Amino acid sequence: MATQTIYDVIVVGSGASGGVAAYTLATKGLKVLCLEAGRMIEPHKDFHNHKPPYRWPYRGHGKPGQYGKLPQGMEWKINEWTDQLFTIPHDDPYALAPGAKFTWTRLRAVGGRTLVWGRESGRFGPLDFKPKSMQDGFGEDWPITYEDLEPYYDKTEALIGMSGGGEAVYNSPASKNALPAFNARCGELLIKKGAAKLGLKTVSMPLAVLSKP
């Protein structure tokens, strides 16, 4: 006789939020089921960043009309390089209330959009939480402060690994668990040299990429 497994928590989606939530709950001893609509990505098959346009049937743009009318801001994301990753709105429309307008770039895969972001991971600073009272008087202040979130920044960065960002700069707090930054590239060195002549300080961008094991 088949038995049914009972879970304490069901997490829908394995992206940045769902993945961390599932991991945190499971390590606390809860029985967690993580549901994911997508498949496991195989980097050597699914990423074609270095494939030149002339090797695609339609120079990377896709067959005319293939993707339907893409929402503004999404037209540069979905093409022959990426259509095996992203959900095509024309084929699988976003579920909305009648009359509502909303778009979101979706990627159905284990790990979600953590697979396709640039990994720049600077912290919000104190001013970002208080635009009205501490900046220009516009907008509304958040009901929380940077100090409220700081312990969670520390925990998250220690978990996922953060390179660079170990030095604070105006309204950009330092990462306390930062790994060494990657070596600067040629263009970055030129910018750093020019900034130094102007008396401007440059720091490495915090990246969620491991610079050492």
Language-model regions, residue ranges each:
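N-terminal glycine-rich phosphate/pyrophosphate-binding loop and immediately adjacent elements
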Residues: 2-132, 136-138, 143-147, 151-154
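Active-site/ligand-binding neighborhood in enzyme catalytic cores
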Residues: 122, 157-213
